[in-house]
Swiss-Prot record:
Zn(2+) binds at C429, C432, C447, C453. The lineage of its organism: Bacteria, Pseudomonadati, Pseudomonadota, Alphaproteobacteria, Hyphomicrobiales. Its cofactor is Mg(2+); Mn(2+). It comes from Bartonella tribocorum (strain CIP 105476 / IBS 506). Coiled coil: none annotated. This is DNA ligase.
Amino acid sequence: MNKDGIKNLTVVEAERELEWLAKEIARHDVLYNRDDQPEISDAEYDALRRRNAEIEALFPELIRVDSPSHKIGAAISEKFEKSVHAQPMLSLDNAFSAEDVYEFVERIRRFLRLPETQVLEITAEPKIDGLSLSLRYEKGRLVRAATRGDGTVGENVTANARTIADIPQVLQGDFPDVIEVRGEVYMGREDFQALNISQQEKGKLTFANPRNAAAGSLRQLDSRITASRKLQFFAYACGEVSEIFAESQMEMMTKLKEYGFVINPLTKVFKTVEDIISYYRDIEERRYSLNYDIDGIVYKVNDLMLQKRLGFVSRSPRWAIAHKFPAEKAMALLEDIDIQVGRTGALTPVARLTPITIGGVVVTNASLHNEDYIKGIGHKGEPIREGRDIRIGDTVIIQRAGDVIPQVVDIVLEKRQKDSSAFVFPDLCPACGSHAVREVGEAVRRCTGGLICPAQAIERIRHFVARNAFDIEGLGKKQVEFFFHAQDEALCIHTPADIFTLERRQEKSLIRLENIEGFGTVSVRKLYDAINARREIPLSRFLFALGIRHVGEVNARRLARAYQTYTAFETAAMEALMPCKQDNKEGNEAWMELTNIEGIGPQVGSAIVDFYQEAHNREVLAVLLEEITPLDEVPIMTASSPIAEKIIVFTGTLAHMSRDEAKALAERLGAKTSGSLSKKTDLLVAGPGAGSKLTKAQEFGVQVIDEEAWMRLIKGHNI
């Protein structure tokens, strides 16, 4: 990202940066809203959005279709049924200073043409750091609860919402026939601390903060887990209502309280900007005495008719704004830098600090982000902290941004020890000793150990047995964790080959699996049968199961079609030599063949070559291949195929086969499949519940057929 002033950007630079910002913000939206695993602080995220908005303001002709200024939240998880919001759940614009708040009020006055003498009432309430939820009531009964999702479609979490005591199942008093109540699900600080203690005692993962704990608890597939987590709910607004039941925001809140909802008692109405700024400062001072996390104050125009007149701008209402609290800072001594290995192999540096207190919380660790952040120079050569690097022994400035993730933001150069030396980031994984590499254009260094890295092992095994890989029934998350942590050699599963030797090892063991709680003779027999049924597997599924970075289902199918046998693929991966810019060498023939496959390219090719260059991975694969056989890919017969070279999209529910099977079959017959519909799509196969894709197809003039017509189309070609 160009750090220079926006006014100095050329059109080309602005266009490139807007493209980068769109992708980067979308990535962080997914991490925060869907995965509950943010990588950056709220302040850093807000800075990205501000930068995007400022560039768009200066170059309006460059505003992209996928601009973050038009989008809310992130795509929803596939774990839950989709739920369409009757009215969009919008996000709020942010204010970061008193000047921003004055400007917000002035914009409203200008838009409404209000004279200075007319009082404009504003409500103010703490901005809860939790998970937004929409509750739909019909005839006074809760019928649906949905997360924000992308603002239009959320996740249906009704069963879990019913377990939250603050959410009434039946409304009280005189209420509209239909009412959607919006609010925030959160976890109190004391309950959060108790939950993490319980998780530690059970040997389970702990949560980084109350917001992640609340989001993770609400998104459980087992509502009994949600019920045990002590979630709470503050109502703060309404979506769709069948009749008007209040004239002001404050009256609405009072009514919601009468209906049985919990309303934040700190919500107040003010008549001047000076008063709401005073309220902001008061709450900021008191925030750590509250039993829940807040990251600012939300201001709303009190008059609901004025709210309606003001309307919305893109992704947010004109009549509301979030005044964010600044991040708090303190100085600490950097005692050490630890390198942690994440589930995907990412090496993440963590600062170990002398204990300090920020905002009432003792901080001993802080984020250092990545290798470049420590060096003080970005991967594109741009300076970070004006080029100052971070060293062990430095006095560093710690920021607890967004009340969530402490991070090192700068150093006090005057206090640096004279004999200090620059930190050398490891190029070997501290968990397994494999090479840790950086892809071109990425700031993260990743372990290539893959199948043998203990830091990644459980997730790798889970991926290996997943539905679209080996699809071994009876090896779910709990079972994989049990076998991985088993102390007995006859029970442990640390590598994929261990799955297929389990039955043989058990035959010689005194500790029998069927005698262990949670298993039994019947279930163990079913598990062995499920394992043995996968000793032969299609090549594409095998390649996907290996978990090579960037080799998802689509690329695995492309590679299988290109090489047709595992031996040919492995030989190509072993022989491929990547280009070397330093020596001015081009890639060899095997490299060119690999990277010229449609959709593969240098990035995917590099990941494949790195994977096979690790001796550990080759050793694990050799043992695995003694137990299983990847089946040769049958060549595509396109000459007589009625769908060869066509772009096909599947939507809705199919009765004769799953959508994944239908996609695989279409590709075997020479078609290209896509998850999204465009004007280039040739055919939409629509089952029941097709939804928006069906409407789009009609708009674009795309041919639409049902499943029966699809079956007739491919009859006789099913290879």
